[in-house]
């Protein structure tokens, strides 16, 4: 601006010192309102599943196949084929998934946004997505970016001679970055000290992320690298800030293949991959393409989020030589693994075991490996000069597959049996790109495999007539006459439904897995009480199914219906007549359809809705409540009304009375909020996590509470919501809102209802 000093606006709206700057420990409630309809340009009536079904899928695949060899001057294809670049794009989109909280993954196209679009491990993937833009533009809303990124990786494999296991669409895009994902607390790229506990002073304040609580279960927070062990902070699944998995040079840049194997096993395991799947993914993925380290990293400019406007969303502008083609700098490593980098082969393993390797450095100065004594010289094609041949090279993380005893055994078997590698890679790749898709009812398209896969948490289809309104009324009558309390009915239904995670769409009441291992043994589910309730409900189920002339009710449905009956009874106790929405159609999975180890990741070690914590955590309980609420896709008002209702329904684990601010438990009243906001009560801590509320006049203890309870009076936003429900005219609204939020949680996994 020519006269900038006279501009009346020195700062734009939203700038300046923020509340978070003043109070860095402030509870982050914004994660409960992200991805609102206001941010979605597609409109509230847009149905992506319907749009995808109208897609000319085969025409799209033909266009993608043609793109693979349509090299562009502005970003030339290595070896004349973009396939390896697109495989990396899809892999790095899906590979952010982690089992601990189900977050990350390819499910919403987050690679387009910060921080992922600017991670050091994603250098040059901005170019991959830009190459795809003409195709995305052509097909528009019928293919999401999330689906297109993954499908392009699949087509890339097929175009280079590999037979994939299948593909499913159904990943709807979002339009802003996920703010709920904890990627670590380091404040510099490729930092890793905090996640291994070596620099605790620089960690973010409590409330940021979920740090390890129980060493026996998750490992200590302190690093024990000197003893050969590294203990990675939960829920992270990458060794350094901005990496997908491991440092390819070795742990902290130390070129030790055996140590690298430990990092690989830890990080791939946290992405739900076992040793065989891990070897297959690495050996299969590295059958193609190359890495890029033509020159020193100081030639590379800022990442996309820091680049100038003129770069138009691209980043990492390279001043080395031409800045592209043979002069490309991505990881700083310059490795080509095979003689056939654009064709499926077993040459990766042939080279890995066919040569003895010695340490060398890339042109950028990064640790990598070459065959000893010049073996294999000139056997590898040059990516951009058909008249040149180069030597084989490997990464430290590649040599891990040879020098780790377990990985070596698997790798040698794949070397001797290429068909086994092909099958294992096809299956592991399919799992990688679909791990966060949820139940099969969300899968779309003509290339779905017919085989039932255990990691998909299969649920049988209902093959019998469902219960009707008359049956539902009769069943609720039997449930309420069974002798089970409101608390028992509601607690059991919550235990089943609240395992749902909106992140990877796992869990929920459908499947009836509450009656199976491991869920029936979880401490949070109160196994003794659960066994009692399930026996009663199974009796009602058996009686109904024996005399229903073909109609059947699953235990999964009956558990939810029992919870609904409890809520309706509690509302009636308070003078309100309500009917909780109920949608039959859930079925019961078998123990054989249930991966006990995999379901273990859904176990709630804390659940603020039930005032439950298995142990003391570094992160405050109220922050963990917000985390749980976000996984349940709840808004702040929904979370608030559920807490208030569940407390007065006496659903705390172990029947503790913390937060049960009522003298009429089992009655659906707004007593929790009225008594929480009562200025006649003074609160004092009895420990870091528990409090007593004493009558200001008499000094006698009226109530006890946890941090989760008191945050609804302490946090200004939550207090504003609590005041709504504590008001004299809010009794009916409270019941109505509780019923709506309850019904939402009960149906979170019913994707079949939304098709």
UniProtKB/Swiss-Prot annotation:
Residues annotated as catalytic: 92
GO molecular function: catalase activity; heme binding; metal ion binding
GO cellular component: cytosol
Keywords for this protein: Heme, Hydrogen peroxide, Iron, Metal-binding, Oxidoreductase, Peroxidase
Enzyme Commission numbers on file: 1.11.1.21
Reactions mediated catalytically: H2O2 + AH2 = A + 2 H2O; 2 H2O2 = O2 + 2 H2O
Broadest EC class assigned to this enzyme: oxidoreductase
Chain segments carrying region Disordered: 193-229
InterPro entries the record matches: Catalase_peroxidase (IPR000763), Haem_peroxidase (IPR002016), Haem_peroxidase_sf (IPR010255), Peroxidases_AS (IPR019794), Peroxidases_heam-ligand_BS (IPR019793)
Cofactor section: heme b
Basic and acidic residues compositional bias, start-end: 215-224
Position of the Tryptophyl-tyrosyl-methioninium (Tyr-Met) (with W-91) cross-link: 245-271
Gene3D superfamilies, sorted: 1.10.520.10, Peroxidase, domain 2
Binding positions for heme per the UniProt entry: 286
Residues with site note (Transition state stabilizer): 88
Function as written in the Swiss-Prot or TrEMBL entry: Bifunctional enzyme with both catalase and broad-spectrum peroxidase activity.
Alphabetical list of NCBIfam families matching this protein: cat_per_HPI, PRK15061.1
Subunit text: Homodimer or homotetramer.
UniProt name for this protein: Catalase-peroxidase
Species of the source: Pseudomonas fluorescens (strain Pf0-1)
């Amino acid at each position: 601006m020519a006269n900038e000093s006279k501009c009346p606006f020195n700062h734009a709206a939203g700038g300046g010192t923020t509340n978070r700057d003043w109070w860095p420990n402030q509870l982050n409630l914004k994660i409960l309102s992200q991805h609102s309809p206001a941010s979605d340009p597609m409109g509230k009536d847009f149905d992506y599943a319907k749009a995808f079904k109208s897609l000319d899928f085969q025409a799209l695949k033909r266009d993608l196949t043609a793109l693979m060899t349509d090299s562009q001057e502005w970003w030339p294809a290595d070896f004349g084929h973009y396939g390896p670049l697109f495989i990396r794009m899809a892999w790095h989109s899906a590979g952010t998934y982690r089992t601990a909280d189900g977050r990350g993954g390819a499910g919403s196209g987050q690679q387009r946004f910060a921080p992922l679009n600017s991670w050091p491990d994603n250098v040059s993937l901005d170019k991959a997505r830009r190459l795809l833009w003409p195709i995305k533009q052509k097909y528009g809303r019928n293919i999401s970016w999330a689906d297109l990124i993954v499908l392009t990786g699949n087509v890339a494999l097929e175009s280079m001679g590999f037979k994939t296991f299948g593909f499913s669409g159904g990943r709807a895009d979002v339009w802003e970055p996920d703010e709920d994902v904890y990627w670590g607390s380091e404040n510099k790229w490729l930092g890793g000290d905090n996640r291994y506990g070596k620099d605790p002073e620089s960690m973010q304040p409590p409330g940021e992320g979920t740090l390890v609580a129980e060493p026996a279960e998750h490992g200590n927070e302190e690093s024990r690298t000197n003893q050969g062990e590294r203990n990675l902070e939960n829920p992270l699944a990458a060794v350094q800030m901005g990496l997908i998995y491991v440092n390819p040079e070795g742990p902290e840049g130390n070129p030790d293949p055996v140590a690298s194997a430990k990092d690989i096993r830890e990080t791939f395991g946290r992405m739900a991959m076992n040793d065989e799947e891990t070897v297959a993914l690495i050996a299969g993925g590295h059958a193609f393409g190359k890495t890029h380290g033509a020159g020193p990293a100081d030639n590379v400019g800022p990442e996309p989020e820091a680049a100038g406007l003129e770069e138009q969303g691209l980043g990492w502008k390279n001043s080395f030589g031409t800045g592209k083609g043979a002069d490309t700098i991505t990881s700083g490593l310059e490795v080509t693994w095979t003689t056939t980098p654009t064709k499926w082969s077993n040459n990766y393993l042939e080279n890995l075991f066919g040569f003895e390797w010695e340490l060398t450095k890339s042109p950028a100065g990064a640790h990598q490996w070459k065959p000893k004594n010049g073996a294999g010289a000139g056997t590898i094609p040059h990516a951009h000069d058909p008249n040149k041949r180069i030597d084989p090279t490997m990464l430290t993380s590649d040599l891990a597959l040879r020098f780790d005893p377990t990985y070596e055994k698997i790798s040698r078997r794949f070397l001797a049996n290429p068909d086994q590698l092909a099958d294992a890679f096809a299956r592991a790749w399919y799992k990688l790109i679909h791990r966060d898709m949820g139940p099969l009812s969300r899968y779309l398209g003509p290339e779905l495999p017919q085989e039932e896969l255990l990691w998909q948490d299969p649920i049988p289809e209902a093959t019998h007539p469902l219960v009707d309104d008359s049956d539902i009324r009769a069943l609720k009558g039997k449930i309420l006459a069974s002798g089970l309390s409101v608390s028992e009915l509601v607690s059991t239904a919550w235990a089943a439904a609240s395992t749902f995670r909106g992140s990877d769409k796992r869990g929920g009441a459908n499947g009836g897995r509450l009656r199976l291992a491991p869920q029936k043994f979880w401490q949070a589910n109160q196994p003794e009480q659960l066994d009692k309730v399930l026996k009663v409900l199974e009796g009602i189920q058996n009686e109904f199914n024996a005399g229903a002339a073909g109609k059947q009710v699953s235990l999964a449905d009956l558990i939810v219906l029992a919870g609904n009956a409890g809520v309706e009874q509690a509302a009636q106790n308070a003078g309100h007549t309500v009917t909780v929405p109920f949608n039959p159609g859930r079925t019961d999975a078998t123990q054989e359809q249930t991966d006990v180890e995999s379901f273990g990741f859904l176990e709630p070690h804390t659940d603020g809705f039930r005032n439950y914590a298995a142990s003391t955590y570094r992160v405050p309980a109220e922050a963990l409540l917000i985390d749980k609420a976000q996984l349940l896709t709840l808004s702040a008002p929904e979370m608030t009304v559920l807490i208030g209702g569940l407390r007065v329904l006496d659903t705390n684990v172990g029947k503790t009375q913390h937060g049960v601010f009522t003298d009429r438990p089992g009655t659906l009243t707004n007593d929790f909020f009225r008594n929480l906001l009562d200025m006649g009560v003074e609160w004092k801590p009895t420990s870091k996590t528990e409090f007593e509320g004493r009558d200001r006049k008499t000094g006698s203890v009226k109530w006890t509470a946890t941090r989760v309870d008191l945050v609804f009076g302490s946090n200004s936003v939550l207090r504003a919501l609590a005041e709504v429900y504590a008001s004299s005219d809010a009794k009916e609204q409270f019941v109505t809102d509780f019923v709506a939020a309850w019904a939402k949680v009960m149906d979170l996994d019913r994707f079949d209802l939304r098709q």
